[in-house]
UniProtKB/Swiss-Prot annotation:
This is Putative defensin-like protein 282. One of its GO terms (cellular component) is extracellular region. Keywords: Antimicrobial, Disulfide bond, Fungicide, Plant defense, Secreted, Signal. Belongs to the DEFL family. Disulfide bonds join C51-C83, C66-C90, C72-C92. It is found in: Secreted. The keyword Cytoplasm does not apply. Its main location: secreted. Transmembrane segments: none annotated. Residues 1-25 form the signal peptide. One of its GO terms (biological process) is killing of cells of another organism.
């Protein structure tokens, strides 16, 4: 009987681990992470768990660094903005 209980417990643990892997499989990050493990220059984690990487061409005082408009929406304090791709920085509204 002990072997059957051990087998059931082991099967449950393996199933739980597999489910966790599937759930996290499409995610690169969790919010509040800086994505340094994914992006060479850091970046932001989006709501869907994907890293948006900072541009390597960031100019100091250009606003928050960006690679896409989505990054500026997240970093401009919720007021929106767009990415000035020429300087790699956000223009916040």
């Amino acid at each position: 009987m002990a072997n059957a209980t051990s087998f059931i417990a082991l099967a449950y643990l393996l199933a739980s681990a597999l489910m966790t892997t599937v759930v996290l499989g499409n995610r690169q990050c969790v919010q509040a992470m800086d994505c340094t493990n994914v992006c060479s220059h850091g970046g932001l984690c989006t709501k869907n768990g994907k890293c948006v990487c900072w541009s390597p061409n960031v100019v100091i005082n250009s606003g928050p660094p960006c690679w896409s408009d989505e990054m500026c929406f997240s970093t401009c304090g919720g007021n929106g903005g767009y990415c000035n791709y020429d300087i790699g920085g956000c223009f916040c509204q």
